[in-house]
């Protein structure tokens, strides 16, 4: 596992990953953890070419780019700079804003820092990650907007966010929160909420929700549904579904504290992905664990560009 035996402090990190060559060697092992394997013929030997960023199969001659198909594809910046940025992002307990990354990395523009951060956030979601299981609390909340929204499920100007968090079973129920999932949803209809659950919660998990009609079909969908009859007040919901409402509060404070609330609907999903990544690794024994995990994910993520990131938009 690459996440082991990695440096926790900045001086040690720079000694380990201070050169492009050191970073290339580590990235090679992340991309081919069991050793090089040609995608064309399956041969296990290759020759390094072009400063070791391209590897040519010794059998069939097919060339494999170390960076192609990763978040680093087509970068004009050395890998040591990328590794440093990832370390700064993952080693900061509360995260780091684009403006702060610009300052620490000495970038010439805010756009560069913003783009790098969004590329890094894309690597915070592992492709094919496992869905939540056992007992899960599920609810929705609203994020953003210039003014406090109206009570209930109709809040103009705010993004709708669905959340699910594992709470355990039996004696451990509610004592220690497990994994978390958050996502921006188009609305709180049954179709939207069941779609969120289908992507994030395994069947036949036990799903605790309030009595909203959007959850009425969960039993038929294959879940063990625990509908709770709650009043319309926030206090009742927070009392009966404490885990997910605790997480909602933490996420909103994180958005306000690290990013000063300056997160629009268009890119909110990416920021939620970062919060989930951090929350799910909150018990890591050292700071290097999130860094190692993110590098492993980075070689599995399809590349993107600033233009694509700007054009992307989530549900209203």
Each model region followed by its residue ranges:
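Residue-level recognition of single "structural anchor" positions
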Residues: 1-316
């Amino acid at each position: 596992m690459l996440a082991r035996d990695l440096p926790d402090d900045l001086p040690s990190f720079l000694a380990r990953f201070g050169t492009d060559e050191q970073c290339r060697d580590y990235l090679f092992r992340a991309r081919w953890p069991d050793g090089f394997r040609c995608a064309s013929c399956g041969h296990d030997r290759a020759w390094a070419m072009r400063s070791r960023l391209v590897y040519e199969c010794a059998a069939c001659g097919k060339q494999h780019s170390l960076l192609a198909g990763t978040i680093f594809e087509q970068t004009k910046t050395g890998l040591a700079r990328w590794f440093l940025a990832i370390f700064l992002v993952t080693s900061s307990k509360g995260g780091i804003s684009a403006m702060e990354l610009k300052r620490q990395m000495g970038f010439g523009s805010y756009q560069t820092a913003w783009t790098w951060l969004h590329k890094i956030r894309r690597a915070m979601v592992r492709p094919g990650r496992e869905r939540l299981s056992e007992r899960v609390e599920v609810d929705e909340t609203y994020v953003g907007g210039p003014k406090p929204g109206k009570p209930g499920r109709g809040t103009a100007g705010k993004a709708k966010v669905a959340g699910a968090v594992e709470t355990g079973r039996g004696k451990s129920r509610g004592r220690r929160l497990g994994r978390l999932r958050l996502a921006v949803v188009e609305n709180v209809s049954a179709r939207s909420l069941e779609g969120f659950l289908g992507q994030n919660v395994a069947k036949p998990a036990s799903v605790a929700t309030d009595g909203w009609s959007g959850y009425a079909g969960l039993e038929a969908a294959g879940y063990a549904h625990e509908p709770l009859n709650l009043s319309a007040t926030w206090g009742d919901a927070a009392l009966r579904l404490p885990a997910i409402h605790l997480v909602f509060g933490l996420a909103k404070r994180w958005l306000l504290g690290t990013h000063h609330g300056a997160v629009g609907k268009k890119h909110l999903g990416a920021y939620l992905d970062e919060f989930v990544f951090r929350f799910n690794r909150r018990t890591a024994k050292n700071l290097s664990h999130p860094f190692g995990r993110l590098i492993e994910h980075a070689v599995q993520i399809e590349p993107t560009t600033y233009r694509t990131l700007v054009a992307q938009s989530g549900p209203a």
